[in-house]
């Protein structure tokens, strides 16, 4: 089974996360940040991963530590669950409309962390949540999960819809990239390792 369970305890956050890449979109998410919980719910549903996240963070100070640290732990769990990455599809792409918003994500699970996060909405807030924090989440996932991620807003007016489109497109692209390819007997790289 492609699963992982990670705990992280610092002075800023206490996180427990369980991940099953071959899940059904089930699990419980509790970070103390309503909008972020909503985004993680979209992630598990559209990636068809089982994901349980419990986080106690210093959200009275700021949301940054919680969002970034959950990204770090999710990335670690993803990397652990993928193991040697044998037999995976490796690449994924999705373009997702959300009302007036259109977002797309490309993913490469080739072991090289890099993030491109393009939206003119970075400076906006969704209620009390800074859109820019999502870039920090994806950067943390990329570094610890060893993946290249390009997220792009193609169109959109409403910041909430753009955030949803980004998470849904990321989830759908991740679902493709982690999928088993029955024809791939080894590691999907000409180098022989990832």
Predicted regions and their residues:
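Structural preference for solvent-exposed beta-strand-turn elements
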Residues: 1-194
């Amino acid at each position: 089974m492609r699963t992982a369970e990670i705990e992280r305890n610092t002075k800023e956050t206490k996180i427990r996360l369980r991940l099953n890449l071959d899940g059904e979109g089930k699990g419980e998410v509790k970070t103390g940040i309503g909008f972020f919980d909503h985004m993680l719910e979209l992630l598990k549903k559209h990636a068809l991963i089982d994901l349980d996240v419990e986080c106690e963070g210093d959200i009275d100070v700021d949301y940054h530590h919680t969002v970034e640290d959950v990204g770090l732990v999710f990335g670690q769990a993803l990397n652990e669950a993928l193991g040697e990455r044998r037999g995976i599809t490796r690449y994924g792409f999705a373009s997702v409309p959300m009302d007036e918003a259109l977002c797309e994500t490309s993913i490469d699970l080739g072991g090289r962390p890099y993030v491109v996060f393009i939206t003119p909405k970075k400076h906006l807030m969704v209620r009390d949540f800074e859109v820019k924090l999502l870039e920090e989440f994806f950067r943390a996932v990329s570094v610890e999960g060893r993946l290249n991620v390009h997220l792009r807003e193609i169109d959109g007016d409403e910041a909430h819809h753009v955030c949803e489109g980004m998470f849904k497109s990321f989830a759908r692209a991740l679902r493709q990239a982690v999928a088993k390819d029955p024809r791939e007997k080894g590691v999907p790289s000409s180098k022989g390792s990832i």
